[in-house]
Every structure is written in structure tokens, then in C-alpha cells.
């Protein structure tokens, strides 16, 4: 068990704690995500496929993008298949109501989060959180002053409906008086129905104000004593909505709840109930449910409660929470009640159809009719007064409507259209949210466009086409009609006449009430067909309309039966799912109890096993000691036997190994002998092959030698021929040289003789000059001695200067030519020898034929460098440059140095003059 848990009790607590953490994690994280994903999937399959799942928040650019709404492939099962959407707001409201019906389970789960005892909040999905926020906004405190007649209270209900929130609309005394007057006027025109019909009543609930008509009608002063009369409009269920539906649904119904001020219209207006036009024309075709009950009267005190009701863990509350069985039963009852009414009122309906079609042709306006459709609509002149968007209160089947409930009539109609009031939503939006199970309904007459005669006839034909299209699979887009009403261009004259006619209907006239004005169009052709009269045509048309209406009734009955069957199937599925949920929870509880019992039993068994194990361990230890001693003896004996057997086995293995080694040695020797013989044979074969190759090589070398010898002899012959020619040339050159030397020698001898003769002449001339000079000096001395006192300058010109030419220079001997010196060594003061004009002649062996022969001989008989120079040792630069003196590091030369020397064969021009003497 571990050191932290000393006993089984702590382990149980630890297990409970871990289990609670796991369950909390599942409830607060995993199940929340799964519910949110399920809601988004349901919305995707019930709305359109173009919208992204909003599991994560969008970016602002995605959030503000407006996309065109498209009809989903998956249609609502409660929707009438041939009903067409006449306005965008109607479709939006129907989607909101269907979403409320689908997400009721999520809201009821949200209602169990917070209790009055301050229980811990659970994490919920974003849709449920939005619904909770909207519900809190509904329950926000508002000051109950006479200026604000709208406030929210909680309806006192029984145990089954205690989780629902009820918005209450309060009206003033003047509004109540006007409503009572209107009720009395309506009751004088036609009797009010005393029975409550929840399904059609919910359709007109937003357009009525609460007026008590039972016991309190006789005593209006009692009710006037109260300052405010709070009338319950309907129970408002907080449904989780997506961000689109939230802005249109709960927010509008909660924050913009208003009561339109009732202004009594003129008495002579055609829309007023007691006008003669209404009595004579519209009274026969007014619907029976012109005044509909919407709920019971409640207290005028407003009680503020928490928007989230406390949760109850009992199975009965769980059954009410997770199912819509009671609501679906009420829907089935309403449908059966409507079918019974239709069968009873078919004659009156056919008469009304005739009057309705005749008045439409006569007035070019729509007149309300009652043809047994899914809902009873108020007349066109009735305007919605209450702006709330109620829903049908959930009936659990245990409580029924009391017979003495107060009936609420329609408010006095306002002559202004409903679209002019900004606080009142459209009637299509109100009716779409009244009944969640019946699907979308027809909009009221005030929300429709005025239909012409041609459009009314074309719609009857379109209904037949829509019956055929009902069995086809749904498409992503509703096909547009061939000629929609918004694109019909009416003639100007007819349109102006219609406007004037409507103005005359809406304003009081001075004509007496018994007189009716004729508004029949005068644009028909004057020529009439004599074959059939107008009465016959009208009769045939009405007969066709009657047949079409009967077919429509049959089709609607089929639709109702299919709808009831589908609702029964949904109810059975939901009950089955609820039963499975309850069984699963019971199984979870049973598993918890069984797990606790198993853990306790396990710990008890563990303790018992521990005690038994201790006793058994002691007995086993004693038995083990005895068995160990016996075992040791057996082991020792077995060890000796095994050692003996091992020794014998080892000896046997040794013998086998020796025999095996002998066999291996023998095989190895045989293999070696075989390999030796094979190697010998191979060696002999290789030797023979080598000898053959050697013989071939020698033969080839011999042939090559003969070829070389022949080439050598040929070359020697050529060389001998060249040598002979060179010898002849040499001899001729020697002869020429001897002749030149002889000529030079003769020339030298002649020159020497001439020089000797010149020397003799010069010697004789010098002797003569010396004698003459001596004679002159003697004469001068004698003359000076004779005239010592006389100072006379005497210019004496020597006859030697003009007597003969100047003595020429002696002949220089030619330089001695050393035949062994070729001028290859230069002295330090010699200039570079010119290659084109060498200073010394090139020897004969270094030019011409001797040079070619010497090169050929050296090519074929290369000198042996090893014999000439011996072994050349590698240079050791360290040994060469081992001395180091300071002057070595100084540059003492006056030459031009370029350091470092350039790489390449080209020598720069600056280096060509670097060796010149300066």
C-alpha cells in the first residue's frame, strides 16, 4: 500500500478523492467541449453549411463579414413543406424558435448549475453562458414606476414548472379601460369563445393585452382599485442561442419590452368593429378566434428571483428536465383539436372562401379568411401591441387549463401601420416564436404585400407545383417564383386608384353608413361573350376553388398525420434516450457501491491473507530448513556423482578429441600433399611458360638488337660520311688558315722591315737635329758674350718644326688568341656578351655538322652520370647556412632588388638592369 496510507480507510479516501477529481474533470472540461461540439453540429445541420463552427472565437475580420443566408439541406421536420418564406425576418424567427426547441436540454442543464444554497458553479458551453447572461438581463431590477409599465416577475407555478422564468407586462388604468371598451364592442359583434385553444392562442399572444373578462368584468371598479395590473404574457424559456439569434431573440424580448399606447380610432372608420362596412362585408368572414386567451392573471407584486433555479437530483425532476414529452403531447392534442374543428367548419369555410375571393377581386386588398390552416390569423386591420416574443408554456401533462381562466381579447386596432413603430417588431417575428413545435407559420396580413388579382390566381397554381416538389430532396436554394411580387409593375392609373381607394377607406367620409362606394375597375373590355354569362364563369371558378380547397384540406390532413407520427417517433426516441440515461446513472451508482464493497472485501481478504501468510511462512521456513539439510546431503552426493561422471565424460571427450585430431592431421597432410603436387605441377607449368616467354623475349630482343645494330651501322655510316666531309672541310679550312697565316706572316715581315727602315731614318734625323741644336747654342753663347750691355729680344724659329712631318704612332700588336678560351667566363668589369655579335669566335665543334653529330652520339650513348659525378648527396641547407653573422641581415649590395621575386618565366624590365655596374 505504501508509506503515505497506513490503513485501508486512507486508501478508500484516496480512491474517492481521485474518482471525484476525475468526474469533475470530465464534467467541467470534456463534457463541456462535447456538448458545445454537439450544439454546433446541430446548428450546422439545421441552418446552413456556409457558416463555420464557432468553437473558437473569430477574428474581427471574420466576425464582421456578412454572408448571404442560404436554406439548409436539412429542413425542420415540423415545418409545413409548401409554406414559403415571405420575409427574411420570418425565416430568422422560425430558426430561432426551432433552435430553442432543440437546445432546451442545454438550458435545463444550465438551470441546475447554481442553487439557492450557493452550490459551486459548473463550467458550461458558450451558448449556455450566453443564454444565462440573457436570462440575467431579463431578471435585472427595474423601478416599478407608473412611467415604466413594463417589469419582470416570476409566475407562481406548480412543482413541474418551477424552473421557468416569466416576464410580466403591466398596463395602466387608461389602457385597461380602452381594452374593456374594445372587448364589449367585439362581444356585441360576435360571441367570444369560452374554451382555451393553446395552439392558435399562442399565435396571437404577442398582439393582445391582458383584459380579465370572467368575474372581474362585472366588477371593474375592484380591479381599478389596484394601481398596476400585472398580466402574464407567456412563460419565456431562456434558450441557448448562437450570437446571431441572440441579438434578435432574447435580447429584443427582454430589453425592448414595450406596451403600445392604445389610441381609439374614429368610429366611422371601416376598420372599426361597429362600422357598417365591417358588419356587412367583413363580419361573415372574420375568424372565430378573433380574441384569444394567452394566460391567467397573476399578482401585481413583482418578486425578484435568481435567473438560475436550484437543481434537484430526484429522478422525477431529471425526467422532466431531459425530455419534451409533455410538450409534444400538448402539440398532438392541439393538432387533433384543429382537425376536429376543420371537419366541423367546412361548409362555413367554403362560403367564406367565396366571399374572400370576391372581395379580393372587388377591393384589390387581402381579406382575412379561415380555411382550417395550421393557425388562425387576426384580420389585416389588427395591429400587434405587445412587443414581447413569447413562447408556448411547457405543459407537463399533469396540470390542465382551468375552466374559469380569464380570456384576453385583442387590443383596439391602431389605424397606423405596425411598421411605423420602431419599438414593435414585425408580426412575422412574433408569430415565429409563439409555437416551437408547429414550425413556421404564415405571417399576419399586415406583414404581407398587397396582392393583385393575377398574383392571387397564380399562387393557387403555385401550390400545385409545390405539392409535386414536396417529395423531391431539399435544395440549397429556394427556387424563385417566375414573377415575384416585388417586381410586378402595376399600371399607373390602377395604382393611383388603389392609393385613393385605400385613403378613402382609412378616413371618415360624409356619406351615410348604409351607402357603399363601388371600386370595381373599369378597364375590362366592353364586349362580353354571349355564350356564357358572368354568373356561369363565377360559378365555375368558385367550383374550381372549392375542389382545390378540398384537395388542399386532404393534403394538410396528410401533413398533420405525418407530423403527428413524426412527433410520436421523436417522443419515443426521447423517452428511450431518457430511460437509457437514467439506467446509466443508476448503473454508475451501483458500480460505485459495488466498487466500495469490493474494495472493503479486498482489504479484509488482504488482512486475512496476511495472517495466513505469516503462519504459513513460519511453517514453510521450518519445513524448508529440514528440506534444506536433506537437500544439501542429496546435493553433495549428486555433486560427487556428477564430478565422477564429468571426469569420465572428460576422459572420453579427450579420447575422442585425440582421435579427431589424428584424423584432422591425416586429412591435413593429405591435403598438403595434394596441394604440394598441384603447386609443383603449377610451378612446372609456370616455369615452362616463363621459359617460353623468356625465349620469345630473347628472340624479340635479338630482333630488336639486330634492328638497332642495323640502324647504328646506318647511322655510323652516315656519321662517317659526315666526318669525312667535315674532315675535308677542316683540311680545307686549315689550308686556308695556313694560307692566311702565311700571308699574315709575310705581311708582318714586310711591316717589320718597313719599321726597321723608319727607325733607322728617325735615328739619323735625331742625330742631325742634336748636332744642329748644339751648334746654335754655341753661337748664342758667343753672341751674348759679345754684346752684354745690349738688351735685345731675338725670336729664333726652330727649323725642326717645319722640316718634316710628325712621327706616327707605333703599330700595335694584335691580341693573343687562346684557342682554349672561349670567352664563357666573364671578369667583373666585362660587359655582357652579345649573342648576335660575340666578342670571341665560336669554335668549330660547337657549330654546324660537328654539333649535330655530337648531339646524336650523346642521345644514343648517354653518359653515365654516376661514374662522372659519383653519388650526389641531398643538400643540407642547415649545414650550408649554419653560420649567422649580424651583417648577413643587412643589405649591403647597391644593386636593384625586387623582393619577393616574381613567379613565372617572364623577367621584368627592371630586373634586366639589376646586374649592371653602377
UniProtKB/Swiss-Prot annotation:
Region IN box, annotated ranges: 826-900
Region entry Interaction with CBX5, spans: 124-248
Residue ranges, compositional bias (Polar residues): 289-316, 395-413, 421-431
Cleavable signal peptide: none
Subcellular location: Nucleus; Chromosome, Centromere; Cytoplasm, Cytoskeleton, Spindle; Midbody
Gene Ontology BP terms: chromosome segregation; meiotic spindle midzone assembly; metaphase chromosome alignment; mitotic cell cycle; mitotic cytokinesis; mitotic spindle assembly; mitotic spindle midzone assembly; positive regulation of attachment of mitotic spindle microtubules to kinetochore
Entries under Pfam families matching the protein: INCENP_ARK-bind, INCENP_N
Main location: nucleus
Phosphothreonine modifications at: 150, 195, 199, 213, 219, 239, 292, 406, 478, 832, 892
Effect of residue 40 to R: Loss of localization to the central spindle and midbody in anaphase or cytokinesis
Region (Disordered): 48-105, 138-159, 190-253, 285-316, 371-489, 607-640, 660-740, 754-787, 826-845
Consequence of substituting residue 169 to E: Abolishes interaction with CBX5
Effect of residue 39 to R: Loss of localization to the central spindle and midbody in anaphase or cytokinesis
Regions of compositional bias (Low complexity) in chain numbering: 197-208, 384-394
Protein name: Inner centromere protein
Organism: Homo sapiens
Family: Belongs to the INCENP family.
Amino acid at each position: 500500500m505504501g508509506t503515505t496510507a497506513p490503513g485501508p480507510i486512507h486508501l478508500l479516501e484516496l480512491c474517492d478523492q481521485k474518482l471525484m477529481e476525475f468526474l469533475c474533470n470530465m464534467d467541467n472540461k470534456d463534457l463541456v467541449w462535447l456538448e458545445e461540439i454537439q450544439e454546433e453540429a446541430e446548428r450546422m445541420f439545421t441552418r446552413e453549411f456556409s457558416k463555420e463552427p464557432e468553437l473558437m472565437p473569430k477574428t474581427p475580420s471574420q466576425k464582421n463579414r456578412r454572408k448571404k443566408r442560404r436554406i439548409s439541406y436539412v429542413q425542420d421536420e415540423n415545418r409545413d413543406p409548401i409554406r414559403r418564406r415571405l420575409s427574411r425576418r420570418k425565416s430568422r424567427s422560425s430558426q430561432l424558435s426551432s433552435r430553442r426547441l432543440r437546445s432546451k436540454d442545454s438550458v435545463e442543464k444550465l438551470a441546475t448549475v447554481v442553487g439557492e444554497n450557493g452550490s459551486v458553479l459548473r463550467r458550461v458551453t458558450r451558448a449556455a453562458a450566453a443564454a444565462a447572461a440573457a436570462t440575467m438581463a431579463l431578471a435585472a431590477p427595474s423601478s416599478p414606476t407608473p412611467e415604466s409599465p413594463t417589469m419582470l416577475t416570476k409566475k407562481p407555478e406548480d412543482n413541474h414548472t418551477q424552473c421557468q422564468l416569466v416576464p410580466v407586462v403591466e398596463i395602466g388604468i387608461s389602457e385597461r379601460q380602452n381594452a374593456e371598451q374594445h372587448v364589449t364592442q367585439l362581444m356585441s359583434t360576435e360571441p367570444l369563445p369560452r374554451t382555451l385553444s393553446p395552439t392558435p392562442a399562442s399565435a396571437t399572444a404577442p398582439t393582445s393585452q391582458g383584459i380579465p373578462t370572467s368575474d372581474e368584468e362585472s366588477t371593474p371598479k375592484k380591479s381599478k382599485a389596484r394601481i398596476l395590473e400585472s398580466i402574464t404574457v407567456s412563460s419565456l424559456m431562456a434558450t441557448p442561442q448562437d450570437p446571431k439569434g441572440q441579438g434578435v431573440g432574447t435580447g429584443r424580448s427582454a430589453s425592448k419590452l414595450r406596451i403600445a399606447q392604445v389610441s381609439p380610432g374614429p368610429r366611422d372608420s371601416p376598420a372599426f368593429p361597429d362600422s357598417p362596412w365591417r358588419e356587412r362585408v367583413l363580419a361573415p368572414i372574420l375568424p372565430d378566434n378573433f380574441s384569444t386567451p394567452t394566460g391567467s392573471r397573476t399578482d401585481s407584486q413583482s418578486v425578484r428571483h435568481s435567473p438560475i433555479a436550484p437543481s434537484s437530483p430526484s429522478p422525477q425532476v431529471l425526467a422532466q428536465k431531459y425530455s419534451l414529452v409533455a410538450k409534444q403531447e400538448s402539440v398532438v392534442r392541439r393538432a387533433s383539436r384543429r382537425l376536429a374543428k376543420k371537419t366541423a367548419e367546412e361548409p362555413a369555410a367554403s362560403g367564406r372562401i367565396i366571399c374572400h375571393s370576391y372581395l379580393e377581386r372587388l377591393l384589390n386588398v387581402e381579406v382575412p379568411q379561415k380555411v382550417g390552416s395550421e393557425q388562425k390569423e387576426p384580420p389585416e386591420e389588427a395591429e400587434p401591441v405587445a412587443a414581447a416574443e413569447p413562447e408556448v408554456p411547457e405543459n407537463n401533462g399533469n396540470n390542465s387549463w382551468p375552466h374559469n381562466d380569464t380570456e384576453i381579447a385583442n387590443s383596439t386596432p391602431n389605424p397606423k401601420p405596425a411598421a411605423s413603430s420602431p419599438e414593435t417588431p414585425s408580426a412575422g417575428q412574433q408569430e415565429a416564436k409563439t409555437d416551437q413545435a408547429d414550425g413556421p407559420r404564415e405571417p399576419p396580413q399586415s406583414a404581407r404585400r398587397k396582392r393583385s388579382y393575377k398574383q392571387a390566381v397564380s399562387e393557387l397554381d403555385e401550390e400545385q407545383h409545390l405539392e409535386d416538389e414536396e417529395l423531391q430532396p431539399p435544395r440549397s436554394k429556394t427556387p424563385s417564383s417566375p414573377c415575384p411580387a416585388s417586381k410586378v409593375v402595376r399600371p399607373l392609373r390602377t395604382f393611383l386608384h388603389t392609393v385613393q381607394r385605400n385613403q378613402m377607406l382609412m378616413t371618415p367620409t360624409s356619406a351615410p353608413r348604409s351607402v357603399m362606394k363601388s371600386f370595381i375597375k373599369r378597364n375590362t373590355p366592353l364586349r362580353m361573350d354571349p355564350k356564357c354569362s358572368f354568373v356561369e364563369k363565377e360559378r365555375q371558378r368558385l367550383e374550381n376553388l372549392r375542389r382545390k380547397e378540398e384537395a388542399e384540406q386532404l393534403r394538410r390532413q396528410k401533413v398533420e398525420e405525418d407530423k403527428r407520427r413524426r412527433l410520436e417517433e421523436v417522443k419515443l426516441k426521447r423517452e428511450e434516450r431518457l430511460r437509457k440515461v437514467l439506467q446509466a446513472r443508476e448503473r454508475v451508482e451501483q458500480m460505485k457501491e459495488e466498487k466500495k464493497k469490493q474494495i472493503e472485501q479486498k482489504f479484509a481478504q488482504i488482512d486475512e491473507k496476511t495472517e495466513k501468510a505469516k503462519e504459513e511462512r513460519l511453517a514453510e521456513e521450518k519445513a524448508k530448513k529440514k528440506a534444506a539439510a536433506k537437500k544439501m546431503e542429496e546435493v553433495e552426493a549428486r555433486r560427487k556423482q556428477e564430478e565422477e561422471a564429468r571426469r569420465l565424460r572428460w576422459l572420453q571427450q579427450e579420447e575422442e578429441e585425440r582421435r579427431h585430431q589424428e584424423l584432422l592431421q591425416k586429412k591435413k597432410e593429405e591435403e598438403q600433399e595434394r596441394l604440394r603436387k598441384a603447386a609443383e605441377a603449377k610451378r612446372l607449368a609456370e616455369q615452362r611458360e616463363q621459359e617460353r616467354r623468356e625465349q620469345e623475349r630473347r628472340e624479340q630482343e635479338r630482333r630488336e638488337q639486330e634492328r638497332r645494330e642495323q640502324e647504328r651501322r646506318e647511322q655510323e655510316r652516315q656519321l662517317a660520311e659526315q666526318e669525312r666531309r667535315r674532315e675535308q672541310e677542316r683540311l680545307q679550312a686549315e689550308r686556308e688558315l695556313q694560307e692566311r697565316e702565311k700571308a699574315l706572316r709575310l705581311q708582318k715581315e714586310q711591316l717589320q722591315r718597313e719599321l726597321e727602315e723608319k727607325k733607322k731614318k728617325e735615328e739619323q734625323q735625331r742625330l742631325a737635329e742634336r748636332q744642329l741644336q748644339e751648334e746654335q747654342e754655341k753661337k748664342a753663347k758667343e753672341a751674348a758674350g759679345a754684346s752684354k750691355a745690349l738688351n735685345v729680344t731675338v725670336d729664333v724659329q726652330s727649323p725642326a718644326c717645319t722640316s718634316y712631318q710628325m712621327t706616327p704612332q707605333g703599330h700595335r700588336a694584335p691580341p693573343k688568341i687562346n684557342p682554349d678560351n672561349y670567352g664563357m667566363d666573364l671578369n667583373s668589369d666585362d660587359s655582357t656578351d652579345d649573342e648576335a655579335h660575340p666578342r670571341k669566335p665560336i669554335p668549330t665543334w660547337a657549330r654546324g655538322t660537328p654539333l649535330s653529330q655530337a648531339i646524336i652520339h650523346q642521345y644514343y650513348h648517354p653518359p653515365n652520370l654516376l661514374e662522372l659525378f659519383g653519388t650526389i648527396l641531398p643538400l643540407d641547407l642547415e649545414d650550408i647556412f649554419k653560420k649567422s653573422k649580424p651583417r648577413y641581415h643587412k643589405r649591403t649590395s647597391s644593386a636593384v632588388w625586387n623582393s619577393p621575386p616574381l613567379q613565372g618565366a617572364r623577367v621584368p624590365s627592371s630586373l634586366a638592369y639589376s646586374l649592371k655596374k653602377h
